[in-house]
Structure formats: C-alpha cells, structure tokens
Amino acid sequence: MPEQPIAVAMSGGVDSSVVAAMLVREGRTVVGMTMQLWNQRRLPELAVEGATTGRCCSLDDVYDARRVAEQVGIPYYVVNFEEQFEEHVVKPFVDEYLAGRTPIPCTLCNNYIKFDRFLEMADSVGAYHMATGHYARIRHDEATGRYQLLRAVDDSKDQTYFLFGLTQAQLARTLFPLGELNKPEVRDMARSMDLAVAAKGDSQEICFVPNGDYAAFMSAYLKEKGVAVEETSGEIVTTDGRTLGRHEGVHRFTVGQRKGLGVATGEPLYVISTNPANHQVVVGGNDDLLRGGFTAKDVNWISIAGVEPGAPVRAQVKIRNRHAAAPARLVATSDRDRVEVVFDEAQRAVTPGQGAVFYAGDLVLGGGWIE
C-alpha cells in the first residue's frame, strides 16, 4: 500500500521550503500547497507597488513556492481561501479594533485557516499529515493520551504563542519539522540544498495590512463595505477625568501605546484603556498600566485537561508575543472556558483582545483571550 502523502503548507519563504525539501530527502511522499488569502487589488488606495496579494501570499511568493516545489520534485497547488480568510480573520480583526480591543489575526488564521481549511485540502489529496514551517514542537503523552505542544528549541523564533487555539485533532495531524532547529541552521540547510529562496528575508508585518498601517486598512476596508467609520473626534482623558485633547477614533489606539497621542503634559503618557461607547481614550502614567491579573475567556486546554476548582495551577503566562512569560496562578471559575489569571507580580499593559498563553517550562498548557 503506497504511503500517504504529507501536505506541506508552502508560503514561498525559507522555512516552509526547507520543510518540503527535508521531507523529500527523508523519502516521504510530499505535496506542496500555497494558500491564497487576500487580494490587495480590492483596496487600491493601499496597494504596495508591484503587489497584488497579501505579503504572505503575493504572486512573488507563489512563484517562489512553485520554483522550490519543482526543484525538489513534488506536486504543487495553489488553494484559494480568500472568502474564508475574510470571514474568520479580516472581519474579526476590524470588528475587534472597533470594539476597543487589540486582535491577533495570526492566531485566528492558524485556528480557522491554516490548521482547519488546509487540513480539508490535505484530505482532498489523500494526505493525513500536514507540515508547516512553524517553530514549535509536538509530542504525544502516552500516559494521558494527549498531544502536547512545546516551545521550539530556538526560543527567539518560537511561535507557540500563536498556536494556543489548536485542538487535539489538529495536533494529531500536524508536523513541525523545524521545532528542533534554530534559524541559522535552517538558513544553512536552504543554502546547502541550493533552494531558490535561500537568501529570501523573513516576513514581519500582518500579511494583509500594507506597511503595518492597520488604521488606514480599516478605513479602506469599511469604505469598500459601505460602512461609515465613526470618525467624530472623541476625548482623550486622564485616569482622573481631566480632558487633555481630542482624537479621531478609538480604533487608532491600543493599550500601552505612547506614540501618536497628540497630547502632552510634560510626563510620558500611555493609553490605559479605550471606551468605544463614549469615544474616550484614557491615558496615564506607566504605573497606571500595571495589572495584578485578568480573566481569560474561550480557553483551549492543550497539554492538560484543565484547571479544577480549588486546585489552582502554577504557570508562566505570556500576554503578548514578545512578553517574557510571568509567574502566575491559574484559578478555575464556574465556567470551564474561563480562567482567572493572578500574577505573582503586576504586569504592564494587559490588553483586551490579546492572547494569554499558559506555559510550564517548555510545555504549552493552553491559552485563551484576555477579556
């Protein structure tokens, strides 16, 4: 009986290209696929010269992925997920900002597109496993029967923060071949295999937001939809209620932001919170950003079954990707999908809409969304 192929999600970058080449060298049957997610032509006022699609799925990226597939001798397909991407990633991204929260589109994309719709496409080519260029590790715990998610060996490239929504069913079918490698090793492998993308740089920004200007993207997107963004100036106020100035929309601000406030008091000011209902942006000093804890909602447990009432779990908690995980207690609530996070020491800029990911060493216990 022929071996089932492995479907590799190829972005046209170095990491996924090395994954495809590694698997071929191991003698595995591989099929390459690139996901078409967003067409930049829809919003011409934001178009970047020479680009017709989002940064992670531009025509250049498709061309690069196809070249690598031809190099390593595997079938290659482009699959169009633009409709699903807009529904599950772009629209929630816009809605969250308008609601005064700061979203993580990469996590939504992982949950609903890369590890959901893509697996459906893997089924269509007879593949059980999919492989990606993510820096993370998976192992199966024989004692509990659970698939566990672990940090990558290269902590500087670790992407587990964006993977906290993966289910047991998704983890069972996923391979992360780069989890035991560091980025320089991957670059060296790309060069040694003479891959066409060996010298290609890494993408940094949100793939569908040109130049990282999310406020401009939102305005253009809502204009296309015929929705008027509430641009009426609101107040910028201090934590004690003093009005310092006005702004052009709460969706332009996020907790912890310092630049672009347009007001000054002689002391550094930061966004403490936003209130879309009354169009207020609340600002204050650095100490006003400190929080002793928060509630995480829609919690997805990965490496453990959950937190039991009366039995808090110790963990290190990350509240954004570049945050150094902080020691905390996870306390059960009456709702299993919610957890109270109590830090040992107050943390700065706990931001509604961001992810909270719970770690025990390298092990990802689970994660949820900051309320």
From Swiss-Prot:
InterPro entries associated with the record: MnmA-like, MnmA-like_C, MnmA-like_central, MnmA-like_central_sf, Rossmann-like_a/b/a_fold
Region (Interaction with tRNA) location: 157-159
Disulphide-bridged cysteine pairs: C109-C207
Any one GO biological process: tRNA wobble position uridine thiolation
EC class name: transferase
Pfam families per the UniProt record, alphabetical: tRNA_Me_trans, tRNA_Me_trans_C, tRNA_Me_trans_M
Reactions mediated catalytically: S-sulfanyl-L-cysteinyl-[protein] + uridine(34) in tRNA + AH2 + ATP = 2-thiouridine(34) in tRNA + L-cysteinyl-[protein] + A + AMP + diphosphate + H(+)
Annotated site residue numbers, Interaction with tRNA: H134, Q354
Gene3D superfamilies with a match to the protein in the record: Adenine nucleotide alpha hydrolases-like domains (2.30.30.280), HUPs (3.40.50.620), Translation factors (2.40.30.10)
Subcellular location: Cytoplasm
Enzyme Commission no: 2.8.1.13
Residues that, per the record, bind ATP: A9, M10, S11, G12, G13, V14, D15, S16, M35, G133
GO-annotated cellular components: cytoplasm
Active site: C109, C207
Domain of life: Bacteria
Keywords, alphabetical: ATP-binding, Cytoplasm, Disulfide bond, Nucleotide-binding, RNA-binding, Transferase, tRNA processing, tRNA-binding
Cross-referenced CDD domains: MnmA_TRMU-like
Entry similarity comment: Belongs to the MnmA/TRMU family.
Function: Catalyzes the 2-thiolation of uridine at the wobble position (U34) of tRNA, leading to the formation of s(2)U34.
Name of the protein: tRNA-specific 2-thiouridylase MnmA
Gene: mnmA
